[in-house]
Structure formats: C-alpha cells, structure tokens
C-alpha cells in the first residue's frame, strides 16, 4: 500500500527531538557498525565511565541516535547515556592476555541489534563502549559506532575524543573529584545535512547521477567468490562474519610506495585481484574491479560545510579496474594509475547521490535500483585504505550480519587498512565458513605484497 505524501511530518511536530528521516544513502548504513580499538596505559574502568558520561555529550555526534517510526529510521536527538550492560561493558573474561595476540585472533562480529534504549525500545543507540583490562599494565578500549554516524576516516575523529577522556583520567588518576565532575571537553557541533545529500555539493549536475555510470556497466557478471563450505542442513545461526587483523611495518611500506610510485590502496587491490585470478586460474587480462571508498570531502564540488565536516559518513565508491600485467610491480603501478584515473570523474559523488535516491523523500518508500556492482554476482572485490590515524596500535573493524537465507552465495569479503607512523594494520572481514583455499591464497598474496 502506497503511503501518503509526507506522512512522516506529523511525527516531527509531535516530537521536537526527531530531526529527519534517513535518506537512501544513510538508510542502509544503519545495518552495520564500525569499530575502533586501541590499547592504553592501565586506567580504571569506573573512572572512564564517570568521566565519559559527563564529557562525551559535549560532542554533538554522540547525541544522535536512530529512532524507528512505523519501522522507518529517523535521526533522533537524545543525549548520550552510558548504560551499563546495554551500551557500556566491562569485559573480564577475555582469553587473550596480550593485545597483539587479541588482534591476530579470529573474532566473531558481535550482533548489537539489541543495542536498544531500555526506556524506549524504538531507539537504537548509536554507540557502544567496551573496556577490558588486558594485563596489569594495559587497558583495551573498543568503541563501536553505527555506520551512519561515520565512515572509516571519521570514525577515528570520533575516537580521538575518547582518547582525550583517557588522557584526562590517567593524568588525574589521584583526583576523584576532578574525574567525577570536571567537564573539560568544549562543545563541538555536528550538523546533520539535508535529506538526499544534494546540498553538500556546489554546481552538481543532476544529470550526472540520474543515469548509471558507464564504469558500473563495465563490471562483468562473473561470480568471483566461492560458495561457502556449508550444506543446506546447517543451522543458519552458526553462520556469521568474523574479523582478523594483520600487522605490518608501515615505515618499510611507505618507503616502498614512494620509491615505486604506488600506494597502500593499490597494494590492497593488487592483493585481491591477483588472488582471484590465481584461485580461478583466470587469464591475466581478465578485468577485476574493486569497490574503493573515496572521501567526498576532498571533491572540488564539496561545499564549505562538507569540506570542514569531521563526522558522519561521506565516503563514496570508486570502481578502479585491475588487469594483470604479468609482474607484481607492474600490477601495483597499473592499479595505482587506475585509481588516479577514477578520481576526477566524480564516481564517488555519483555513488552517494544514486544511493540517496533509493528512498523517496515524500513517502519514504524504498526503490533500491542503484545498479551498483554486486560483490556476489560480479567481478568486484572490496578493499579500502582508510589512511593515517592516531593511536598506539589502533585497529579498525566492521560489524554486520550475514544474509542467513542465502549466505552460501551472497556474502562479502573485505580488507581495510589503517596506519600510524610505525604500523599498518589490515582488517579482514569474511564469513566463518569461507572456502579455506581461497582465503589462504589471499593471505599469501597479502604477505607477499606487504612484506616487500
């Protein structure tokens, strides 16, 4: 049944905390969460709880939750509350007693769909914090944020405010009154853009994104992920995504990239394209594309608001083409140039805008016909170099649920990287029943490339 036009506006009148419905770009970002993790000198969990509860609401982005009205998500203004065992946890039963060991182990993607406000279960809380004493000298912090509030790059801007909380309580560990009562973070506004994302850009021609980009139409229909190693009788609840982290020497990688005119992103693309050709015994000339998030804030079409925005999700996808050159270094250089060729064509802006069109503003009805390349049925891999972040040994993860009804064929494999001055950490997201031979070929290519 078709809804009446602007049926939802009545709710905005009734509740002033409702900001607006999520548009098509934001809508699908409510189904996944991003996680920033790092290790710190030992601090008291209760000190963090009290100090964060007072200070993080100073930063507007922490006060945006998601409220469902007639099953549709809306941006909702509600002050961040750290509710123990709802969105704040102290972990005492971690098996690993070393942070580096923890990163290297397989970790189940935690379902946090039950991260609901106990006072109003129509509100999904956007943030979750987990504190774990790894050993007598270190404390691990895991911050999880709903994807609509951040992309991989802006997630660590948000996490930097958590670092400020930790720095403060470590510095003032003997002053309980200060930790419990001091509000030291200055207010930081986070303005939600208008529905549809269009107002974020200057001189954006609507014709540019109303038609399907030629590059998307180039991606061939060719399944390049093997079926999961499961049979039809398996308990579907036993199928889920797992993450694992791999650590490399960034200084060596940086020197290699500079010397050979390549990039970390081209290394990720090369790793996946070479592994795919090797597993399927494909000819070198077989084109394989990569879903490559690219920061829209750097576009020459971005307005001042978007250029200066430090929160929310603003990454749109490029789809650089990879063709094997018969030589590893030549592959890296080819893929580096392929990425550069995509950027001036504004493909990332087009992907954002086409995604935003998936929701009708008047009725909020769904029309998911973006025609964006599909990871399960087309020759398209997925990887992203998020870039440099602050931290001691930070790590990035994605949390999402798998399509349990068609998990055998419909899933994603994704590799994302972040780096500091010394370390580059790659996260691998894949299903727990992934074909072991296929995955091992990817890891072998990764080790071969990132240990150059």
Regions found by a protein language model. Name each.
Residues 77-91:
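Structured interaction and signal-relay segments at domain junctions
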Residues 247-263:
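Surface-exposed, Lys/Arg-rich phosphate-binding patches that contact polyanionic backbones
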Residues 264-273:
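Short amphipathic alpha-helical segments
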Residues 150, 163-171, 258, 272-281, ...:
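Hydrophobic/aromatic-lined pockets within catalytic cores
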Residues 1-75, 81, 95-126, 254, ...:
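Acyl-thioester-dependent acyl-group transfer interface
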Residues 2-23, 149, 153-156, 161-252, ...:
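Non-catalytic, low-complexity flexible loops and terminal extensions
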Residues 44, 151-155, 264-265:
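Hydrophobic (often cysteine-bearing) scaffold residues that line and stabilize catalytic clefts
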Residues 108-109, 115-169, 178-188, 417-442:
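Histidine-centered acyl-transfer/condensation active-site motif
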């Amino acid at each position: 049944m078709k809804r009446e036009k602007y049926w939802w506006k009545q709710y905005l009148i009734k509740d002033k905390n409702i900001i607006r419905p999520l548009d098509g770009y934001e809508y699908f970002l409510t189904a996944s969460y991003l996680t920033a993790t790092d290790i710190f000198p030992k601090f008291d969990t209760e000190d963090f709880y009290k100090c964060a509860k007072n200070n993080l609401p100073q930063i507007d982005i922490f006060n945006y939750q998601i409220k469902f009205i007639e099953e549709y998500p809306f941006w909702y203004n509600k002050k961040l509350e750290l509710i123990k065992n709802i969105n704040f946890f102290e972990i005492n039963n971690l098996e690993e007693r070393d942070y580096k060991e923890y990163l290297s182990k397989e970790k189940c993607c935690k379902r946090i769909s039950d991260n609901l406000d106990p006072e109003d279960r129509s509100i999904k809380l956007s943030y979750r914090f987990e504190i774990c004493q790894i050993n007598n000298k270190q404390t691990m912090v895991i911050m999880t944020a709903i994807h609509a509030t951040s992309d991989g790059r802006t997630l660590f801007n948000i996490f930097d405010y958590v670092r400020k909380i930790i720095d403060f309580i470590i510095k003032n560990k003997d002053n309980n009154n200060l930790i419990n009562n001091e509000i030291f973070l200055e207010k930081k506004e986070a303005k939600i853009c208008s529905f549809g994302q269009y107002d974020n850009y200057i001189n954006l021609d609507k014709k540019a994104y109303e038609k399907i980009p030629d590059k998307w139409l180039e991606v061939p229909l060719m399944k390049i992920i093997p079926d999961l190693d499961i049979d039809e009788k398996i308990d579907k609840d036993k199928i889920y995504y797992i993450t694992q982290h791999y650590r490399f020497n960034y200084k060596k990688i940086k020197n290699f990239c500079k010397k050979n005119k390549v990039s970390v992103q081209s290394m990720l693309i090369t790793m996946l394209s070479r592994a795919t050709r090797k597993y399927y015994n494909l000819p070198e000339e077989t084109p394989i594309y990569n879903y490559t998030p690219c920061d829209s804030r750097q576009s020459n079409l971005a307005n001042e608001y978007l250029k200066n925005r430090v929160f929310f999700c603003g990454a749109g996808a490029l789809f650089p083409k990879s063709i094997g050159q018969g030589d590893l270094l030549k592959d890296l250089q080819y893929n580096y140039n392929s990425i550069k060729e995509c950027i001036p064509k504004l493909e990332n802006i087009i992907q954002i805008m086409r995604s935003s069109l998936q929701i009708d503003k008047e009725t909020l009805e769904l029309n998911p016909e973006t025609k964006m390349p599909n990871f399960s049925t087309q020759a398209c891999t997925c990887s992203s170099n998020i870039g440099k972040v602050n931290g001691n040994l930070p790590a990035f993860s994605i949390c999402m649920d798998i399509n349990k009804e068609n998990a055998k064929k419909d899933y994603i494999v994704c590799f994302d990287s972040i780096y500091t001055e010394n370390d580059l950490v790659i996260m691998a997201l894949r299903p727990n029943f992934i074909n072991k031979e296929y995955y091992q070929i990817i890891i072998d290519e990764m080790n071969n490339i990132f240990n150059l």
